[in-house]
């Protein structure tokens, strides 16, 4: 607690276990930052490569679009309550959707502004395509969309 006056934007990770003397020092950001040198979901990924960072942003964008598709009326109506098989399918789709939502949340916990913008853009594009009716199957007039909550 002697270093309370330090106002750095990163916090050093816990020291490596025995035998890890040759490891590089990693930082866990505690505030939003802009830069391609980040770790999203996995240690060392995407690394310092600009191309891998762009791929990571594209993956986050696609994941957000997929989440909007899985929550769209088209998917919800196709697995509406009926037979046991349809209810089981609806439960499986819901489980996949929640799992992917948590994965997206973990990606956002990298505190990288690019990841945040990719996720918001993906949700907006997915909403426009699947929920607002651009690709058909949107909500009818006067019908409210369910809250986008985990």
UniProtKB/Swiss-Prot annotation:
Keywords from the UniProt entry: Copper, Copper transport, Ion transport, Membrane, Transmembrane, Transmembrane helix, Transport
Record's protein name: Copper transporter 3
Function description: Involved in the transport of copper.
Family to which this protein belongs: Belongs to the copper transporter (Ctr) (TC 1.A.56) family. SLC31A subfamily.
Major localization class: membrane
Pfam families: Ctr
Record organism: Oryza sativa subsp. japonica (Rice)
InterPro entries recorded: Cop_transporter
Signal sequence interval, chain numbering: none
This protein's record includes keyword Transmembrane helix: yes
Top-rank lineage group of the source organism: Eukaryota
Transmembrane segments: 50-70, 100-120
Entry's Gene Ontology cellular component terms: plasma membrane
Topological category with respect to the lipid bilayer: Multi-pass membrane protein
Record-level Gene Ontology MF annotations: copper ion transmembrane transporter activity
Subcellular location as annotated: Membrane
């Amino acid at each position: 607690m002697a270093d309370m006056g330090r106002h750095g934007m990163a916090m050093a990770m816990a020291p490596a276990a025995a035998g890890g003397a040759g490891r590089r020092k990693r930082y866990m950001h505690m505030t939003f930052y802009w830069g391609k040198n980040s770790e999203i979901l996995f240690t060392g990924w995407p690394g310092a490569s600009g191309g891998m960072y762009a791929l990571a942003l594209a993956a986050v964008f696609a994941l957000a679009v997929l989440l909007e598709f899985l929550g769209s009326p088209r998917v919800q109506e196709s697995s509406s309550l009926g037979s046991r098989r349809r209810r089981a399918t609806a439960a499986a789709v819901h489980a996949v959707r929640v799992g992917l939502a948590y994965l997206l949340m973990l990606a956002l916990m990298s505190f990288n502004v690019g990841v945040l913008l990719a996720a918001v853009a993906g949700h907006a594009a997915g909403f426009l395509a699947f929920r607002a009716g651009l690709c058909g199957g949107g909500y009818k007039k006067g019908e409210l969309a369910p809250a986008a909550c985990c």
